[in-house]
Amino acid sequence: MRVVILGSGVVGVASAYYLARAGHEVTVIDREAGPALDTSFANAGQISPGYAAPWAAPGVPLKAVKWMFEKHAPLAIRLDGTRFQLQWMWQMLRNCTTERYALNKGRMVRLAEYSRDCLQALRAETDIQYEGRTGGTLQVFRTQQQLDGAAKDIAVLREANVPFELLSSDELKKAEPALAAVSHKLTGGLRLPGDETGDCQLFTTRLAALAEQLGVKFRFNTRIDALAVAGGKIAGVQCGGEMVRADAYVVALGAFSTNLVANLVKIPVYPLKGYSITAPIVDAAKAPVSTVLDETYKIAITRFDERIRVGGMAEIVGFDKRLRQARRDTLEMCVNDLFPGGGDTANASFWTGLRPMTPDGTPIVGRTPVPNLFLNTGHGTLGWTMSCGSGQLLADLMSGKKPAIRADDLSVHRYLSETDGEHRPAYA
Protein backbone atom coordinates (compact mmCIF):
# COMPACT_ATOMS: atom_id res chain seq x y z
CA MET A 1 0.00 0.00 0.00
CA ARG A 2 1.24 3.50 -0.85
CA VAL A 3 1.20 5.71 2.24
CA VAL A 4 1.87 9.44 2.53
CA ILE A 5 2.84 10.72 5.98
CA LEU A 6 2.54 14.42 6.67
CA GLY A 7 5.11 15.49 9.25
CA SER A 8 8.71 14.48 9.94
CA GLY A 9 8.89 14.95 13.69
CA VAL A 10 9.66 11.98 15.89
CA VAL A 11 6.08 10.65 15.60
CA GLY A 12 5.95 11.01 11.82
CA VAL A 13 9.35 9.41 11.29
CA ALA A 14 8.53 6.55 13.67
CA SER A 15 5.30 5.99 11.75
CA ALA A 16 7.25 5.89 8.49
CA TYR A 17 9.80 3.43 9.84
CA TYR A 18 7.27 0.93 11.17
CA LEU A 19 5.01 1.21 8.11
CA ALA A 20 7.98 0.59 5.81
CA ARG A 21 9.06 -2.35 7.91
CA ALA A 22 5.54 -3.74 7.49
CA GLY A 23 6.03 -3.66 3.72
CA HIS A 24 4.33 -0.41 2.72
CA GLU A 25 5.61 2.14 0.21
CA VAL A 26 6.03 5.30 2.28
CA THR A 27 6.61 8.95 1.44
CA VAL A 28 7.07 11.60 4.16
CA ILE A 29 6.34 15.25 3.39
CA ASP A 30 7.42 18.20 5.55
CA ARG A 31 7.87 21.94 5.14
CA GLU A 32 11.15 21.89 7.09
CA ALA A 33 14.61 21.20 5.62
CA GLY A 34 15.06 17.96 7.57
CA PRO A 35 13.56 15.72 10.25
CA ALA A 36 12.78 16.91 13.78
CA LEU A 37 13.38 20.60 13.16
CA ASP A 38 10.20 21.82 14.83
CA THR A 39 8.49 20.40 17.95
CA SER A 40 10.93 17.46 18.25
CA PHE A 41 14.05 19.62 17.97
CA ALA A 42 14.94 20.48 21.58
CA ASN A 43 12.45 18.80 23.89
CA ALA A 44 13.23 17.80 27.46
CA GLY A 45 15.00 14.61 26.37
CA GLN A 46 13.15 12.14 28.54
CA ILE A 47 11.50 8.81 27.75
CA SER A 48 9.29 8.51 30.80
CA PRO A 49 6.45 5.99 30.58
CA GLY A 50 5.83 6.00 34.31
CA TYR A 51 5.49 9.77 34.40
CA ALA A 52 3.05 9.75 31.51
CA ALA A 53 0.22 11.77 32.99
CA PRO A 54 -2.29 14.36 31.78
CA TRP A 55 -1.87 18.01 32.64
CA ALA A 56 -5.58 17.88 33.42
CA ALA A 57 -5.41 16.68 37.02
CA PRO A 58 -7.27 17.21 40.30
CA GLY A 59 -6.22 20.49 41.86
CA VAL A 60 -4.92 22.05 38.65
CA PRO A 61 -7.73 24.65 38.35
CA LEU A 62 -6.92 26.10 41.78
CA LYS A 63 -3.19 25.90 41.09
CA ALA A 64 -3.70 27.75 37.81
CA VAL A 65 -5.24 30.68 39.69
CA LYS A 66 -2.31 30.76 42.11
CA TRP A 67 0.24 30.51 39.29
CA MET A 68 -1.18 33.67 37.72
CA PHE A 69 0.59 35.65 40.45
CA GLU A 70 3.90 33.75 40.59
CA LYS A 71 7.09 34.81 38.83
CA HIS A 72 8.25 31.28 37.96
CA ALA A 73 4.83 29.73 37.39
CA PRO A 74 4.79 26.57 35.23
CA LEU A 75 1.57 27.58 33.46
CA ALA A 76 0.51 30.79 31.73
CA ILE A 77 -2.64 31.59 29.77
CA ARG A 78 -3.21 34.35 27.26
CA LEU A 79 -6.44 34.40 25.27
CA ASP A 80 -5.83 34.16 21.53
CA GLY A 81 -9.31 35.31 20.52
CA THR A 82 -10.49 31.95 19.21
CA ARG A 83 -13.52 29.97 20.28
CA PHE A 84 -11.44 26.82 19.90
CA GLN A 85 -9.07 27.88 22.68
CA LEU A 86 -11.93 28.54 25.10
CA GLN A 87 -13.60 25.25 24.20
CA TRP A 88 -10.33 23.36 24.61
CA MET A 89 -9.65 24.88 28.05
CA TRP A 90 -13.18 24.09 29.19
CA GLN A 91 -12.84 20.47 28.14
CA MET A 92 -9.46 20.27 29.88
CA LEU A 93 -11.11 21.50 33.08
CA ARG A 94 -13.74 18.79 32.71
CA ASN A 95 -10.94 16.23 32.79
CA CYS A 96 -9.54 17.53 36.09
CA THR A 97 -11.50 15.03 38.18
CA THR A 98 -10.03 12.11 40.09
CA GLU A 99 -11.94 9.60 37.97
CA ARG A 100 -10.94 11.05 34.62
CA TYR A 101 -7.35 11.60 35.73
CA ALA A 102 -7.00 7.91 36.59
CA LEU A 103 -8.62 6.86 33.31
CA ASN A 104 -6.48 9.16 31.20
CA LYS A 105 -3.23 8.39 33.01
CA GLY A 106 -3.92 4.66 32.75
CA ARG A 107 -4.20 4.66 28.98
CA MET A 108 -1.26 7.04 28.63
CA VAL A 109 0.94 4.74 30.71
CA ARG A 110 -0.28 1.76 28.67
CA LEU A 111 0.86 3.32 25.39
CA ALA A 112 4.04 4.75 26.89
CA GLU A 113 5.11 1.41 28.39
CA TYR A 114 4.45 -0.32 25.07
CA SER A 115 6.41 2.39 23.29
CA ARG A 116 9.43 1.86 25.52
CA ASP A 117 9.30 -1.86 24.71
CA CYS A 118 9.25 -0.98 21.00
CA LEU A 119 12.19 1.40 21.46
CA GLN A 120 14.20 -1.24 23.28
CA ALA A 121 13.51 -3.74 20.49
CA LEU A 122 14.50 -1.14 17.90
CA ARG A 123 17.73 -0.42 19.74
CA ALA A 124 18.57 -4.12 20.00
CA GLU A 125 17.86 -4.63 16.30
CA THR A 126 19.59 -1.55 14.86
CA ASP A 127 21.99 -0.31 17.57
CA ILE A 128 20.66 3.20 16.99
CA GLN A 129 22.65 5.76 19.00
CA TYR A 130 21.24 9.03 20.34
CA GLU A 131 23.18 9.86 23.54
CA GLY A 132 20.75 7.59 25.33
CA ARG A 133 20.92 6.72 29.01
CA THR A 134 19.00 4.11 30.98
CA GLY A 135 19.45 5.57 34.46
CA GLY A 136 15.77 6.15 35.19
CA THR A 137 14.06 9.41 36.08
CA LEU A 138 13.66 11.10 39.45
CA GLN A 139 10.80 13.43 40.38
CA VAL A 140 11.82 15.66 43.28
CA PHE A 141 9.43 17.31 45.72
CA ARG A 142 10.01 20.56 47.57
CA THR A 143 7.03 20.29 49.96
CA GLN A 144 5.44 17.59 52.07
CA GLN A 145 2.16 18.22 50.27
CA GLN A 146 3.78 17.30 46.95
CA LEU A 147 5.25 14.15 48.46
CA ASP A 148 1.89 13.13 49.89
CA GLY A 149 0.19 13.92 46.58
CA ALA A 150 2.32 11.34 44.80
CA ALA A 151 0.01 8.67 46.22
CA LYS A 152 -2.46 8.99 43.31
CA ASP A 153 0.34 8.43 40.80
CA ILE A 154 1.76 5.52 42.76
CA ALA A 155 -1.64 3.82 42.70
CA VAL A 156 -1.66 3.95 38.89
CA LEU A 157 1.96 2.76 38.73
CA ARG A 158 1.13 -0.23 40.91
CA GLU A 159 -1.87 -1.09 38.76
CA ALA A 160 0.30 -0.94 35.63
CA ASN A 161 3.13 -2.92 37.31
CA VAL A 162 5.59 -0.07 36.78
CA PRO A 163 8.62 -0.33 39.12
CA PHE A 164 9.15 2.68 41.37
CA GLU A 165 11.02 3.84 44.47
CA LEU A 166 9.79 6.45 46.94
CA LEU A 167 12.88 8.17 48.35
CA SER A 168 13.45 10.40 51.35
CA SER A 169 15.46 13.59 50.94
CA ASP A 170 18.56 11.83 52.26
CA GLU A 171 18.11 8.97 49.79
CA LEU A 172 17.96 11.18 46.69
CA LYS A 173 21.74 11.18 46.35
CA LYS A 174 21.67 7.43 45.67
CA ALA A 175 20.03 8.18 42.33
CA GLU A 176 21.54 11.62 41.72
CA PRO A 177 24.77 12.18 43.69
CA ALA A 178 24.89 15.91 42.91
CA LEU A 179 21.62 16.45 44.82
CA ALA A 180 23.46 15.76 48.08
CA ALA A 181 24.42 19.44 48.20
CA VAL A 182 20.79 20.61 48.04
CA SER A 183 18.90 17.78 49.75
CA HIS A 184 17.89 20.16 52.57
CA LYS A 185 15.65 21.97 50.06
CA LEU A 186 13.77 18.80 49.15
CA THR A 187 11.30 16.55 50.97
CA GLY A 188 11.82 13.44 48.87
CA GLY A 189 11.37 11.99 45.43
CA LEU A 190 9.72 9.38 43.26
CA ARG A 191 12.16 7.41 41.10
CA LEU A 192 11.23 5.27 38.13
CA PRO A 193 14.28 3.11 37.35
CA GLY A 194 12.89 1.89 34.02
CA ASP A 195 12.75 5.31 32.35
CA GLU A 196 15.33 6.50 29.82
CA THR A 197 16.74 9.70 28.35
CA GLY A 198 18.42 10.93 25.18
CA ASP A 199 18.51 13.47 22.37
CA CYS A 200 15.20 13.27 20.50
CA GLN A 201 16.39 15.26 17.48
CA LEU A 202 19.43 13.02 17.07
CA PHE A 203 17.27 9.92 17.47
CA THR A 204 14.78 11.13 14.86
CA THR A 205 17.51 12.00 12.35
CA ARG A 206 19.09 8.56 12.68
CA LEU A 207 15.73 6.79 12.58
CA ALA A 208 14.96 8.68 9.35
CA ALA A 209 18.20 7.30 7.90
CA LEU A 210 17.15 3.78 8.89
CA ALA A 211 13.74 4.41 7.31
CA GLU A 212 15.42 5.48 4.08
CA GLN A 213 17.26 2.16 4.03
CA LEU A 214 13.82 0.52 4.06
CA GLY A 215 12.77 2.56 1.04
CA VAL A 216 11.05 5.54 2.68
CA LYS A 217 11.21 8.70 0.58
CA PHE A 218 11.47 12.06 2.32
CA ARG A 219 10.30 15.23 0.62
CA PHE A 220 11.55 18.19 2.66
CA ASN A 221 11.05 21.89 1.99
CA THR A 222 7.59 21.01 0.68
CA ARG A 223 4.56 23.08 1.54
CA ILE A 224 1.42 21.19 2.64
CA ASP A 225 -1.63 23.21 1.62
CA ALA A 226 -4.68 20.96 1.84
CA LEU A 227 -6.16 17.49 1.66
CA ALA A 228 -8.18 16.90 -1.49
CA VAL A 229 -11.35 14.83 -1.10
CA ALA A 230 -13.28 12.83 -3.69
CA GLY A 231 -15.89 10.13 -3.21
CA GLY A 232 -15.74 10.40 0.57
CA LYS A 233 -12.01 9.62 0.65
CA ILE A 234 -8.74 11.51 0.52
CA ALA A 235 -7.72 11.84 -3.13
CA GLY A 236 -4.37 13.52 -2.54
CA VAL A 237 -2.32 16.16 -0.76
CA GLN A 238 -2.07 19.57 -2.39
CA CYS A 239 1.57 20.67 -2.14
CA GLY A 240 1.89 23.98 -3.93
CA GLY A 241 1.08 23.27 -7.56
CA GLU A 242 1.44 19.51 -7.17
CA MET A 243 -1.03 16.88 -6.04
CA VAL A 244 0.65 13.98 -4.22
CA ARG A 245 -1.44 10.81 -4.32
CA ALA A 246 -1.40 7.58 -2.32
CA ASP A 247 -3.70 4.86 -1.03
CA ALA A 248 -3.67 6.06 2.57
CA TYR A 249 -2.66 9.23 4.39
CA VAL A 250 -1.29 9.81 7.90
CA VAL A 251 -1.44 13.25 9.51
CA ALA A 252 1.38 13.59 12.05
CA LEU A 253 1.77 17.36 12.05
CA GLY A 254 1.54 17.90 15.78
CA ALA A 255 -0.41 21.03 16.68
CA PHE A 256 -0.75 21.88 12.99
CA SER A 257 -2.84 18.75 12.41
CA THR A 258 -6.05 20.40 13.65
CA ASN A 259 -6.41 23.00 10.91
CA LEU A 260 -5.41 20.63 8.11
CA VAL A 261 -8.20 18.15 8.87
CA ALA A 262 -10.77 20.68 10.16
CA ASN A 263 -13.15 20.20 7.23
CA LEU A 264 -13.05 16.41 7.60
CA VAL A 265 -12.92 15.65 11.31
CA LYS A 266 -12.80 17.88 14.39
CA ILE A 267 -9.85 17.05 16.63
CA PRO A 268 -9.15 18.87 19.91
CA VAL A 269 -5.38 19.26 19.48
CA TYR A 270 -4.13 22.63 20.73
CA PRO A 271 -0.56 24.03 20.80
CA LEU A 272 0.90 24.03 24.31
CA LYS A 273 3.99 26.20 24.20
CA GLY A 274 7.09 24.98 26.01
CA TYR A 275 10.67 26.16 26.40
CA SER A 276 14.12 24.66 26.82
CA ILE A 277 17.72 25.66 27.26
CA THR A 278 20.71 23.47 26.43
CA ALA A 279 23.87 24.20 28.40
CA PRO A 280 27.38 22.76 28.11
CA ILE A 281 28.51 20.81 31.19
CA VAL A 282 31.29 22.50 33.14
CA ASP A 283 31.54 20.06 36.06
CA ALA A 284 30.22 16.53 35.53
CA ALA A 285 30.26 15.81 39.27
CA LYS A 286 27.78 18.64 39.82
CA ALA A 287 25.53 17.71 36.90
CA PRO A 288 22.65 15.20 36.80
CA VAL A 289 23.32 11.65 35.65
CA SER A 290 19.88 11.14 34.11
CA THR A 291 16.60 13.13 34.22
CA VAL A 292 15.36 15.02 37.27
CA LEU A 293 11.82 16.42 37.29
CA ASP A 294 11.15 19.42 39.52
CA GLU A 295 7.52 19.05 40.63
CA THR A 296 7.23 22.66 41.76
CA TYR A 297 8.18 24.26 38.46
CA LYS A 298 7.20 21.35 36.16
CA ILE A 299 10.69 21.39 34.67
CA ALA A 300 12.80 18.44 33.49
CA ILE A 301 16.58 18.54 33.74
CA THR A 302 18.24 15.93 31.51
CA ARG A 303 21.84 14.84 31.08
CA PHE A 304 23.22 14.26 27.59
CA ASP A 305 26.85 13.30 26.96
CA GLU A 306 28.35 16.77 27.29
CA ARG A 307 25.23 18.90 27.70
CA ILE A 308 22.33 19.53 30.07
CA ARG A 309 18.86 20.05 28.59
CA VAL A 310 16.39 21.94 30.80
CA GLY A 311 12.83 22.03 29.53
CA GLY A 312 9.26 22.47 30.59
CA MET A 313 6.49 24.90 31.44
CA ALA A 314 3.30 25.43 29.49
CA GLU A 315 1.76 28.46 27.87
CA ILE A 316 -1.73 28.37 26.39
CA VAL A 317 -1.15 31.22 23.94
CA GLY A 318 -1.97 29.84 20.49
CA PHE A 319 0.78 29.62 17.87
CA ASP A 320 2.95 32.35 19.37
CA LYS A 321 6.60 31.19 19.17
CA ARG A 322 8.29 34.28 20.55
CA LEU A 323 11.05 33.57 23.05
CA ARG A 324 10.40 35.17 26.42
CA GLN A 325 13.37 36.06 28.61
CA ALA A 326 11.32 35.46 31.76
CA ARG A 327 10.97 31.80 30.77
CA ARG A 328 14.70 31.47 30.24
CA ASP A 329 15.24 33.00 33.67
CA THR A 330 13.00 30.32 35.20
CA LEU A 331 14.83 27.48 33.45
CA GLU A 332 18.20 28.84 34.53
CA MET A 333 17.00 29.39 38.09
CA CYS A 334 15.71 25.82 38.36
CA VAL A 335 18.82 24.04 37.08
CA ASN A 336 21.17 26.30 39.03
CA ASP A 337 19.14 25.75 42.19
CA LEU A 338 19.28 21.95 41.97
CA PHE A 339 22.64 21.52 40.23
CA PRO A 340 24.71 24.63 41.02
CA GLY A 341 27.93 24.74 39.02
CA GLY A 342 26.94 21.83 36.80
CA GLY A 343 26.26 23.68 33.56
CA ASP A 344 27.17 26.94 31.85
CA THR A 345 23.69 28.41 31.63
CA ALA A 346 24.99 31.82 30.58
CA ASN A 347 26.03 30.28 27.26
CA ALA A 348 23.04 27.99 26.83
CA SER A 349 20.97 27.93 23.67
CA PHE A 350 17.30 28.92 24.09
CA TRP A 351 14.39 27.32 22.21
CA THR A 352 10.61 27.13 22.18
CA GLY A 353 8.23 24.61 20.64
CA LEU A 354 4.50 23.92 20.38
CA ARG A 355 3.39 20.64 21.92
CA PRO A 356 0.23 19.13 20.39
CA MET A 357 -2.04 18.64 23.41
CA THR A 358 -5.48 17.08 23.78
CA PRO A 359 -7.81 18.04 26.66
CA ASP A 360 -7.46 14.59 28.23
CA GLY A 361 -3.71 14.29 27.59
CA THR A 362 -4.05 11.08 25.56
CA PRO A 363 -2.85 11.21 21.95
CA ILE A 364 -5.01 10.48 18.93
CA VAL A 365 -3.71 7.41 17.11
CA GLY A 366 -5.58 5.42 14.49
CA ARG A 367 -8.45 5.57 12.03
CA THR A 368 -10.83 8.44 11.35
CA PRO A 369 -14.34 8.51 9.87
CA VAL A 370 -12.63 9.12 6.50
CA PRO A 371 -11.69 5.59 5.33
CA ASN A 372 -8.13 6.26 4.15
CA LEU A 373 -7.20 9.02 6.61
CA PHE A 374 -5.27 8.17 9.77
CA LEU A 375 -4.05 10.33 12.65
CA ASN A 376 -0.95 10.14 14.83
CA THR A 377 -0.95 13.37 16.80
CA GLY A 378 -1.80 14.99 20.13
CA HIS A 379 1.03 13.47 22.18
CA GLY A 380 1.58 16.64 24.20
CA THR A 381 4.82 16.55 26.17
CA LEU A 382 5.27 12.83 25.51
CA GLY A 383 5.90 12.68 21.77
CA TRP A 384 9.20 10.89 22.06
CA THR A 385 8.10 8.73 24.96
CA MET A 386 5.17 7.44 22.88
CA SER A 387 6.61 7.67 19.36
CA CYS A 388 7.77 4.12 18.70
CA GLY A 389 4.68 2.57 20.24
CA SER A 390 2.41 4.93 18.34
CA GLY A 391 4.23 4.17 15.09
CA GLN A 392 4.05 0.42 15.57
CA LEU A 393 0.42 0.61 16.66
CA LEU A 394 -0.52 2.62 13.59
CA ALA A 395 1.40 0.27 11.29
CA ASP A 396 -0.49 -2.70 12.73
CA LEU A 397 -3.87 -0.99 12.31
CA MET A 398 -3.12 0.04 8.74
CA SER A 399 -1.81 -3.44 7.91
CA GLY A 400 -4.91 -5.18 9.24
CA LYS A 401 -3.05 -6.73 12.17
CA LYS A 402 -4.29 -6.88 15.74
CA PRO A 403 -2.25 -4.41 17.84
CA ALA A 404 -0.30 -5.69 20.83
CA ILE A 405 -2.18 -3.34 23.16
CA ARG A 406 -5.72 -2.03 23.39
CA ALA A 407 -6.13 0.75 20.84
CA ASP A 408 -9.83 1.62 20.60
CA ASP A 409 -9.66 4.32 23.28
CA LEU A 410 -6.70 5.99 21.58
CA SER A 411 -8.45 6.86 18.32
CA VAL A 412 -10.31 10.04 17.45
CA HIS A 413 -13.59 8.17 17.86
CA ARG A 414 -13.48 8.77 21.61
CA TYR A 415 -14.10 12.44 20.79
CA LEU A 416 -16.77 12.06 18.13
CA SER A 417 -20.54 11.86 18.29
CA GLU A 418 -22.99 11.64 15.46
CA THR A 419 -25.29 14.66 15.28
CA ASP A 420 -27.29 15.41 12.14
CA GLY A 421 -24.76 13.52 10.07
CA GLU A 422 -21.87 15.67 11.23
CA HIS A 423 -18.92 14.63 13.35
CA ARG A 424 -18.82 16.94 16.33
CA PRO A 425 -16.32 16.98 19.20
CA ALA A 426 -17.77 15.21 22.22
CA TYR A 427 -14.57 15.34 24.33
CA ALA A 428 -15.54 12.19 26.23
Swiss-Prot record:
GO CC annotations on file: cytoplasm; plasma membrane
GO molecular function: D-amino-acid dehydrogenase activity
EC primary class: oxidoreductase
Catalytic activity: a D-alpha-amino acid + A + H2O = a 2-oxocarboxylate + AH2 + NH4(+)
Pathway: Amino-acid degradation; D-alanine degradation; NH(3) and pyruvate from D-alanine: step 1/1
Keywords: FAD, Flavoprotein, Oxidoreductase
Function: Oxidative deamination of D-amino acids.
HAMAP family: DadA
Protein name: D-amino acid dehydrogenase
Organism of origin: Burkholderia thailandensis (strain ATCC 700388 / DSM 13276 / CCUG 48851 / CIP 106301 / E264)
Phylogenetic lineage: Bacteria, Pseudomonadati, Pseudomonadota, Betaproteobacteria, Burkholderiales
